[in-house]
């Protein structure tokens, strides 16, 4: 009986750790912390990527040449 309870507790803890890691990865993607972001004066496309890194936004003054510019703390 103790073995069954111990096995259930261990499997619950393992599942909790796996779930926490997958949620953390999902949050990184949702927050835009992706590896495919580009910096200032780099070409971007808000609708399909590459996306601007945090602190920059994509502006399209001369389509299709959209570039990332600093958001100056907006």
Curated annotation (Swiss-Prot):
Similarity-based family: Belongs to the neurotoxin 07 (Beta/delta-agtx) family. 03 (aga-4) subfamily. Aga sub-subfamily.
Lineage of the organism: Eukaryota, Metazoa, Ecdysozoa, Arthropoda, Chelicerata
Superkingdom per UniProt: Eukaryota
Pfam families per the UniProt record, alphabetical: Toxin_7
Disulfide bonds: 37-53, 44-58, 52-68, 60-66
Single Gene Ontology MF annotation: sodium channel regulator activity
Asparagine amide PTM positions: 72
Protein name stated in the entry: U3-agatoxin-Ao1h
UniProt note on tissues of expression: Expressed by the venom gland.
Comment field on protein domains: The presence of a 'disulfide through disulfide knot' structurally defines this protein as a knottin.
Organism whose genome encodes this protein: Agelena orientalis (Funnel-web spider)
Keyword DNA-binding: no
Cleaved signal peptide residues: 1-20
